[in-house]
Regions:
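Conserved N-terminal segment of class I S-adenosyl-L-methionine
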Residues: 1-89, 93-95, 107-113, 218-227, ...
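Pocket-edge positions in alpha/beta enzyme catalytic cores
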Residues: 10-14, 100, 143
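S-adenosyl-L-methionine-dependent methyltransferase catalytic module, highlighting the catalytic core
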Residues: 46, 63, 93-96, 103-120, ...
Length: 232
């Protein structure tokens, strides 16, 4: 019963998936066959597969050498972080999907700058990341949620007084906020089977309201930003 409820809620919540929006942003750039996209932190290649299916010259990079080997065996173009450092290739598009929330500010600054150094002037960066929520830290290695305003303060060439200044400059071109159903969170019945299933049934109702209202009755829990690299 619990598994059935979870599946129904999962189907009801996806009015428009994040993956679809990422592909829409990439498609809007109308990349030619000579242009290249780098998927940073590509993991299992879940983003690489549909991107390459669009006919785009896409390469993945990840710190996990085991995953990179599996991706290669599956026919995906990938390299490890160490292999990437040995190259001097530049790219037209960078994709950072669910990456930045795993870094503290100082480390994120250097991480992003190291990749933005390899983004061509006029090229684009796509960031997909969650916002703060009661379940942000369900992911054990989530460190900090980041807002578009915060990214702009450090990477947008802002003259505001901040602790960090990036050596690269990016400007926000487009923005999409991900939404999901309202839901109960801190109830024992959501975690332990022996407790009442009422919270799960209430969450099912809230997911249905989210769907019927086309996402109006819900909350924002993440965002995708399309940025362009510009001269400082």
């Amino acid at each position: 019963m619990n598994g059935v409820i979870k599946k129904i809620i999962s189907r009801l919540r996806d009015i428009r998936s994040e993956e679809e929006k990422i592909l829409e942003f990439i498609s809007s750039l109308r990349l030619s066959s000579t242009q290249a996209l780098l998927d940073i932190g590509c993991g299992y290649g879940n983003k690489l597969k549909p991107i390459q299916a669009l006919g785009i010259n896409a390469v993945g990079v990840d710190a996990n050498a085991v995953l990179i080997q599996r991706n290669r065996e599956a026919g995906l173009s990938c390299m490890t972080s160490e292999e990437f450092k040995q190259t001097d290739d530049t790219y037209d598009v960078l994709l950072m999907s669910h990456i930045i929330e795993h870094f503290m500010p100082e480390r994120l600054l250097e991480f992003m700058d190291s990749y933005l150094d390899r983004l061509k002037l006029g090229g684009h960066l796509i960031i997909a990341t969650p916002l703060n929520s009661p379940y942000f830290y369900d992911d054990f290695d989530h460190i900090k949620p980041y807002h578009p305003v915060g990214i702009d303060m450090v990477f947008g060439g802002s003259e505001l007084q901040v602790q960090y200044y990036a050596r690269n400059c990016i400007q926000l071109q487009d923005l999409w906020f991900r939404r999901e159903p309202l839901k109960l969170t801190f109830f024992a019945g959501l975690y332990v089977k022996k407790h009442s299933r009422l919270p799960k049934l209430i969450n099912l109702l809230l997911a249905l309201l989210f769907r019927l209202s086309f996402g109006v009755i819900g909350k924002t829990n993440g965002w995708i930003g399309l940025y362009k690299k510009v001269a400082k």
